[in-house]
């Protein structure tokens, strides 16, 4: 491929494209950059493998720490497994890319995006999405592109294209819109309870910007002399399709119109219809074309039967407005919500069920030291709210090996996490680190939105003072030409056989998260707006059902949740509290059993299983860091005796010395004649010397000062 450098002005910034310089053996590659952020994207195609009946597409996003001038942590000092945010970026690239490949394509495809340089103003993810489209087009892979993506932020009342990290943090919206000439193909968003109208306007605003990038790609192809030929499906032999349609259409229609069937009953009934077709094929002569096709391609019959089922289900919805379970298009499945089902050792739990989808969410409260440390290129280095999603095989009635979380689990967990973030209390209001785990116990569609609802229940049961409860619903779509139907609360078969999976989460005030995926080449804004607006009454209905189980967060935390107290000290006193080599802070921890976390700002969080231990540690630290002035009177305890005086702990962790001459108004020959270790004594600060040592006295203390000191002790 010839080398080409191109720069285009996009919304006040330059986007630079470098083609042909890097990765010469890849099918197509581009270095796409903006500011100091540069992403190399390479797309490669290889010959199809035998027996493949799907598109083997792999999309990988890789981060290198050198991109930010850093060396990786860990013993090996080398990048290992991709961090969670890199996995989410891989999904972000994959989701708008995958639907644009022809359904018949079976070649191995791989798209690899590697961030080579990064600054803290330009996020690399949307550059990688657009770069993936360019690399695929340049590689001349059959592709219904171009496709591009932008990020939309909302700061004040103004929408911003491709905001910086700081603008994203300050704003009320973080929206990624991907589109093609045919329409919007992917949406991913987190929002601060924005009204539906604002979100729709933001998607429209983003799609308009996407059009500029699409035109730039078309211009680039013309400059390179690459003619984009829209692929056509190879000629198919319809012999098997016609046979299956003739033998199975009536049976499949009867099953789809048997609205009282459960999922397992419907699946079993469809299997019976399919089995009758298998028997009919087996009765054919060996030389019959239908039998020859099924013998040559073992998966052909199953795929053809699925295609027929899909067609008939879609026709039923478009024609009659009725779904396979008898629901209306905008009807939500039966809902059940419960809290506190698990023993009290669990800090909070919620069980949410919608139809046959059941999710158990468990909330755990931790200390600031439990926050997740993030070692990637993103400016944020810590997470204090974590949501983890698990979906074991038994949730769909299957058996398979248990694996570590994959991309799907990570993606669903992140979506539910994003949905709750806007309603969580601030660190100052609620200093706990919060982890919610959602266990999908049964799955029949929309488990991620079930996790949103379960998370809300678990957080409220745990006593987390969330600002508003959050619910979510998954919307589907059946579209044929200009005719379409939007489906509320899709179940598994509708997700599998439909054109769209659009997840909408939010409160009664507005939207907190969106995720839209397509199986077609794009949608006009009107259909997207219909889906968002149709989701609102569904969300509110679900929310009201959830509030029947628990209306407000519990007033008290679990008995087994740690007790946290926060105090502020002078940052210059951090070293005093920690002590040489951590000696002092370890001593406090050993004495009290409390855990102590100190931030650079001087914010100290003290936590323990019981409040008394935490309060004891708090008292010690406050005593150590309290400003002491001459003339202050304290009630103390003798800790040591030496020939020239006695040491007294007059504040927790704070000692001073009474010289023998200051023990009494008369001459004292031996300290032991007046004091013993453990004695309670009233002392006054006589002076603080240049080395910070506190000199105490028992002389000249008024009775009123003694009373005030005792009152202070009782109050603490």
From Swiss-Prot:
Disulphides: none
Residues that bind Mg(2+): 495, 501
One Gene Ontology MF term: polyribonucleotide nucleotidyltransferase activity
Entry keywords, A to Z: Cytoplasm, Magnesium, Metal-binding, Nucleotidyltransferase, RNA-binding, Transferase
Catalytic activity, reaction form: RNA(n+1) + phosphate = RNA(n) + a ribonucleoside 5'-diphosphate
Family, similarity comment: Belongs to the polyribonucleotide nucleotidyltransferase family.
Protein name as it appears in the record: Polyribonucleotide nucleotidyltransferase
Organism in which the protein naturally occurs: Synechococcus elongatus (strain ATCC 33912 / PCC 7942 / FACHB-805) (Anacystis nidulans R2)
């Amino acid at each position: 491929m010839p080398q080409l450098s191109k720069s285009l002005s996009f919304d006040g910034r330059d986007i630079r494209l470098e083609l042909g310089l890097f990765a010469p053996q890849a099918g197509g590659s581009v270095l796409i950059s903006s500011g100091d952020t540069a992403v190399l994207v390479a797309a490669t195609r290889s010959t199809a493998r035998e027996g493949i009946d799907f598109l083997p597409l792999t999309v990988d996003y890789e981060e290198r720490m050198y991109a930010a001038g850093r060396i990786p942590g860990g013993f090996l000092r080398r990048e290992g497994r991709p961090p969670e945010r890199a996995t989410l970026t891989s999904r972000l690239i994959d989701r708008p890319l995958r639907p644009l490949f022809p359904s018949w394509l079976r070649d191995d495809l791989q798209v690899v995006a590697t961030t080579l340089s990064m600054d803290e103003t330009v996020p690399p993810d949307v550059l990688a999405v657009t770069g993936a489209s360019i690399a695929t087009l340049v590689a001349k892979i059959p592709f219904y592109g171009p496709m591009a993506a932008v990020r939309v932020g909302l700061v004040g009342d103004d929408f911003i294209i491709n905001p910086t990290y700081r603008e994203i943090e300050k704003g009320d919206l973080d929206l990624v819109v991907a589109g093609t000439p045919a329409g919007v193909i992917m949406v991913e968003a987190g929002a601060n309870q924005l009204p539906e109208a604002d979100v729709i306007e933001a998607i429209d605003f983003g799609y308009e910007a996407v059009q500029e990038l699409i035109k730039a790609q078309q211009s680039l192809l013309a400059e390179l002399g690459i003619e984009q030929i829209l692929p056509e499906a190879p000629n198919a032999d319809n012999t098997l399709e016609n046979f299956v349609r003739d033998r199975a259409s009536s049976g499949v229609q009867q099953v789809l119109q048997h609205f009282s069937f459960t999922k397992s009953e419907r699946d079993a009934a469809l299997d019976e219809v399919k089995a009758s077709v298998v028997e009919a094929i087996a009765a054919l002569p060996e030389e019959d074309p239908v039998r020859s096709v099924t013998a040559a391609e073992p998966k052909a019959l199953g795929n053809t039967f699925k295609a027929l089922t899909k067609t008939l289900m879609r026709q039923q919805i478009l024609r009659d407005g009725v779904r396979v379970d008898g629901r209306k298009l905008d009807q939500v499945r039966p809902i059940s919500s419960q809290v506190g089902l698990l023993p009290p050792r669990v800090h909070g739990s919620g069980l949410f069920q919608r139809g046959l989808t059941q999710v158990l969410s468990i909330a755990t409260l931790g200390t600031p030291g439990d926050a997740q440390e993030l070692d990637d290129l993103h400016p944020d280095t810590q997470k204090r709210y974590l949501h983890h999603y698990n979906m074991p095989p038994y949730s769909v009635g299957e058996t398979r090996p248990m694996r570590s979380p994959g991309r799907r689990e990570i993606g669903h967990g992140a979506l539910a996490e994003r949905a709750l973030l806007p309603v969580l209390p601030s660190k100052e209001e609620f200093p706990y680190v919060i982890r919610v785990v959602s266990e999908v116990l049964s799955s029949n569609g929309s488990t991620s939105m079930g996790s949103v609802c379960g998370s809300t229940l678990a957080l409220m049961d745990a006593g987390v003072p969330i600002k508003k409860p959050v619910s979510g619903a998954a919307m589907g779509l059946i579209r044929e030409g200009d005719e379409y139907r939007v489906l509320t609360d899709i179940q598994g078969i509708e997700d599998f056989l439909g054109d769209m999976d659009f997840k909408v989460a939010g409160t009664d005030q507005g939207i907190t998260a969106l995720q839209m995926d397509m199986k077609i080449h794009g949608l006009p804004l009107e259909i997207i707006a219909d889906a968002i607006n149709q989701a609102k009454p569904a969300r509110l209905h679900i929310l009201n059902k959830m509030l029947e189980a628990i209306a407000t967060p519990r007033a008290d935390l679990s008995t087994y949740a740690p007790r946290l107290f926060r105090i502020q000290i002078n940052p210059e006193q951090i070293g005093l509290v920690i002590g040489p080599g951590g000696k002092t802070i370890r001593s406090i921890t050993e004495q009290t059993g409390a855990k102590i976390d100190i931030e650079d700002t001087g914010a100290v969080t003290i936590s323990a299983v019981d409040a008394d231990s935490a309060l004891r540690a708090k008292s010690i630290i406050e005593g150590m860091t309290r400003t002491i002035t001459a003339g202050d009177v304290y009630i103390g305890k003798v800790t040591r005796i030496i020939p020239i005086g006695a040491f007294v702990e007059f504040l927790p962790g704070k000692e001073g010395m009474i010289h023998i001459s200051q023990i009494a108004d008369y001459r004292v020959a031996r300290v032991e004649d007046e004091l013993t270790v453990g004695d309670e004594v009233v002392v006054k600060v006589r002076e603080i010397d240049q080395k910070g040592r506190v000199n105490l006295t028992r002389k000249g203390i008024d009775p009123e000062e003694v009373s005030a000191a005792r009152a202070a002790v009782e109050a603490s």
